[in-house]
């Protein structure tokens, strides 16, 4: 704590004594004039209400001034008001006594004056940012706009895409308008959130966006009328700094000098913005050391200060901008008070190109690199992540300078990161056993840090592993100097947290070389741990799978002189096969479609606890995708007969991963999507087409319909190696574009035998499209399960399927409402000579006397047709999903 904080009580007593003496020197007329001037001359936009001033004597005024402005600022205010009231002799005496007894540090600048000084300081300090290779670049020139999609902090249903989900808001490019909207909330007329969470995966650009927000605030572009002071707080650094500090100390460290009026700044918390970068690094609140701090002047650990801010027990009216990875958002939201969420989605296609031209200073090189990446569809897709885009640009620049073939650039994040390491080593002319040994130690440092939640490393850490001054240290670690209690503390961190996680995964394989007894032990400990796919080691585990591909293992052997035992890969495969059906498969399937009112609150709490489990299935698919080995994926999925994704707002990358796994799945595989968002958010197009282009467009008759978010999955289903046999879509919104793509897939999917459409939001046009696919001559779907309200409005499409489908043998309408207006055309279709249906399931369907009579007549006419209903003499079978 600073000296001012340490002597808080004594300085307050002195300030009170000075104020009381000055005010008691005033006559009744002077005191009255002082009160009026105090009312009419607000400081920093604030003044004491007249109702509290009107009848106050000297003692009352002293109390109110100290309460309203804080002790030392109150002396400054009093001195200036006395001068305005033309009581100059008392003002002069107060100034002299203030200088003698309190010093001049706080008496020179008002908060308004210091605000301008602080903004100028922030503009100077943050005008440049260091890239991962320690090169400094101007933030305005390097920052490339990101797509940011507003989310919701209230209903989980809105975030996760249940059957009642709203249309997702359009992702907007991160200009000042988008940043200004963050604290407005979804409803402009409702209460504005005090906490905004910028969420997104590793390397997506959350930190850069947060720094740009700070820089634009200092430049007067953001929150000008709402925020007087904004402070950037890297959570990882604060957690690892030794000693204790108060929030006031942390604020003072960011100010241009030690004369900052910290107490007056903190006296107006509603005018403050704290940017907490990397809040996912905080441990759980259950530990005693995480008890939130409530006093901004209490010297304590960084964890307690951050916990106090996040829980709003410390400065509850202050604004918070928090960055966090998606995987830990559920755990973080338990600490926050009504947060507004926004998702950082990386670069749009337009901004990918802008980034390339900003990175390459030579326009011809930029054009060549961008054209190459654009032609590599998978690599181009990966470049939506800014850190991956930076690595790709760095590697391509090195290969250009060395005259090498650009085609060696790879297609997964793992392969891109591995190529980055090897390219950096080659460009530096370093190789051989010494550098290989250094790299092993660097990987070990990364692994130690990941396991301990540590991102900052001391010089002693580097010396212990003989990395101090090494070549790999200068290439892959960035140096930081932090103010310490007695001296500057030097720390090191990896160029990006995701890169540290990649090196940690590589460490497991480098350590696997050796005695058979120790070979795969550490790898198995990683994948078997709860953190492996559900916790903070999820990305490390994903990288591990990517490194286990045959091609990557060969690269590791060539570049690092390491032979990875084959049993490591086989043991990992057996681990995947041992997962059987993840817990997520049964979480939603066993729930009733509609919860009772008294159970809703309890169910919501259970969903929060299960949130990380709900990601298990998708995370496992990401791991398999990262291998890019069809045979490995097929073997892994052979023991997982059903893939289930529940309550996931699927992104394009999620669909890319799912589609690859579906393409590789063995015969008999089932896929169930439950309450998944399948609506793509459209990017806003600002430029209008020219008149000629619009004229050409209107004359064109063969325009291709827009692709749906589900198209990659549909394209995977029609490949000959795809063994997907059962597809169930439950409680999903299915736009017409999705139905169109799914219909095309139904026509030719080689293995699909069963389709379930359960409680989805389908339009009449969508069902018409699906019926066309099901009635197609080459469609192989034999079982169709449908649950939907309002079947009477679309029964004619179902009739078409029954009359025209060459292979449909089972129709399950369990749980549907079947009035007479539906049963009559249904029975007519069943009697049709071309209808080959063998089983009609009507479990839990309420039927009146006339429909029952018509169905009985169908049974008499077609004795081979089994109609399952309790009143028709057949036993019901439960509906799956």
From Swiss-Prot:
Domain called Pyrin: residue spans: 1-129
Effect of residue 518 to S: In salt-sensitive hypertension
Keyword Ligase assigned: no
PTM sites of type Phosphoserine: 104
Disease involvement: Defects in Nlrp6 may be a cause of salt-sensitive hypertension.
Description of how the protein assembles with itself and partners: Homomultimer; forms the NLRP6 inflammasome polymeric complex, a filament composed of homopolymers in response to pathogens and other damage-associated signals. The core of NLRP6 inflammasomes consists of a signal sensor component (NLRP6), an adapter (PYCARD/ASC), which recruits effector pro-inflammatory caspases (CASP1 and CASP4).
Protein name: NACHT, LRR and PYD domains-containing protein 6
Species whose genome carries this gene: Rattus norvegicus
Lineage: Eukaryota, Metazoa, Chordata, Craniata, Vertebrata
